[in-house]
Amino acid sequence: MFKTSLRLSVVTLLMLTSAVFAANLADTRLLDAVKSENLTAVKKALEQGAKVDAADPDGSTALLWAAQRNNDEIVAALLAAGAKATAASRFNMTPLAVAASNGNAKIVTRLLDAGADANSVSKEGETALMSASLNGDAATVKLLIQRGAKVNEAEPYKGQTALMLAAGEGNAKAVEMLLEFGADVKAKSKGGYSPFLFAVRNRQTEAIKALLAHGANVNEATTDGSSALSIAIVNGYFDIGALLLDKGADPNVADPRGSALHAVIWMRRPGAPWEAAALAEDPEGPPKQSGNVTALELARKLLEKGANPNVKWEFKEQRFSKSLGTTRNPPNINLGRHYITFNGSTPFYNAARNGDAPMMKLLVEFKADPKTPNVGGVTPLMAAAALDYYEGETPGPYTGVSEAERLEAVKLALALGNDINARTNFGEYQMLGAPEFQLKTYPTNMDQLLDMGYGDPRFNMMTALHGAVISNQQSIVQFLVDNGAKLDAKNQVGWTPLMMTKGLFLANAFKEFPGTAKILREAMIKQGLPVE
C-alpha cells in the first residue's frame, strides 16, 4: 500500500513538473516570438498556454518588448489576450514609456486606451512625455498631453522638463507643440539652465527660434553669469552667436569671461589650454568652429552691434601658484597656464597676446585703444612680443600661430604707438636673492609675494624685449633690437635680456636661449655696451 501511494505521488509530481515545464517553455516561446516579431508564433504560444504577461528576469514583459520593437500588430494581439498595459520592468520601464520614446502614436493610443497611466515615471523619474519629447514626434507629444500628461513635470535628478529635453535635442516641432499646450519657457533646471539655454548650448537653431518667438529672453544667463551669447561663442557656435545678435542680444551683456568680445578673441586662437587631465577627456582640445560664420566675422558683428572695444577684463584675482608657476585664469574660460594676470586686459590686448594682427586691425577700425595696458602695466606690445608666453599653451609655433604671424602683431602694436621701452609696473615690493639666484628659482621670500595679484613677481619692470627672449622667437628679438629696444634694460631683479638667455627657471622648468643670446651680444657690441 505504501509503495502504491509512493508511486502515485511520484507520478503526480512528474505530471505537475511537466505541466510547469510546458508552461515555462510556452512563456519562453512567447517572449522569443515577440522579440523576433513573429506574430504567428506569438498567437501559437498564447494558444499553448503561455502567460500573456510573461517576463524576462528583469521584469520586461512581452508587451514591453512588443512596444520596444515598434510592432503594432503584436501589441494589439497581446492587449487582446489581456496583457497589462501598466506592467513595468524592475527598472519601472513601462510599455508606454518605450512607445513614447519610439514616437509611435498608434501604439501609445492603444496603451492609453488599455489603461496605461500618461503620467507614469521610470526609475529615474522620466515621464512618457519626456521620452516623446526626446524623440521629437509632435503627434505623440500632443496625444500624451491631451490624455492628461503634465506638461511642466520635471524629473527629480536634474530638474529637466519635457521642453528642456526637446529643446536640447533640437526637436523644434515637439518644442512648438509643448509651447502650444502651456510649457513654461522660463523654467530652470537644477543647474540653472532654461529650455532656451539648453538649445543654445547644443546649437539647436530651429528650437532657439521657436523659443524666442514664445518669450525666451535672448540675454538670459546661467546661475554663474554665463550669457547665452557667450555660451554660443565658447562652444564655437559663431553662427548661433550671430543669430542671437540679430534677435536682439546685448553685445555688452555682463559675462564672467570679461565680455563676449573677449570670448570670441580667445576662441579664434585658443592655443592649447589643456592640462593632462583635460586632454585625457578631450584630446582634440578646445571646441572647433561650427557653422559658416568665422570668429573674425562674429567679432565684426559684435562691434557693429555696439560692443565696447575697450571693455576690460575684471575679476577677483587669486594668488600666484608657486607650485605650478602660474597665475589664476578668469572664471569659466580656460586660457591655459600663464605667468601674468589677465585682469584689466582689453580685447585689443588679448588679440595682441594671441599674435592676431587681423583681429587687432578690426578692433582699431572700431576705435579700440591700442595702447591700454593690463593692471600690471603690461602693454599690448609686450603681450604681442610674448612676455606672458607659456610654451605649448600660449598661441605660438606649437599651437597654430607662426612666428611670422606674431611678428606681424608686434609690428602693428609698435606702429600704433606702443612704447618699445615701456616697463611693467607691479608696484613696489622687495625680492630677496641675487639676480643670478633668481634666474634659477623664485625669490627666497616668494611666499610673501603670492598675493600681489599681478603674476610672477620677477616680471616687474620688464620690457617687450624681455618678453621676446622668453618666447625665444628670434625674428621678434631682431625686430625689437632694430627698432630701438633698450638692450641693457634691467627688470626689478636686475636681469637684462641677455642675462635671461643664459638660462631661466619658468613654470618649474629651466630653459636656455643660445640663438637669442647671439643676436643680443652682437647688437650690444655694436652699441658699445658691456656684454656679461
Each model region followed by its residue ranges:
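N-terminal segments that cap or nucleate solenoid repeat domains
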Residues: 23-65
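Ankyrin repeat domain, specifically the short helix-to-loop turn at the C-terminus of the second helix
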Residues: 46-51, 76-84, 109-117, 142-150, ...
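Ankyrin repeat boundary signal
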Residues: 54-55, 85-88, 118-121, 151-155, ...
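Start-of-repeat signature of ankyrin repeats
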Residues: 26, 59, 92, 125, ...
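Leucine-rich solenoid repeat scaffolds
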Residues: 487-529
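Conserved ankyrin/ankyrin-like repeat signature
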Residues: 41, 73-74, 106-107, 139-140, ...
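Ankyrin repeat A-helix N-terminal signature
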Residues: 32-36, 65-71, 98-104, 131-137, ...
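Bacterial N-terminal signal peptides that target proteins for export
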Residues: 1-10
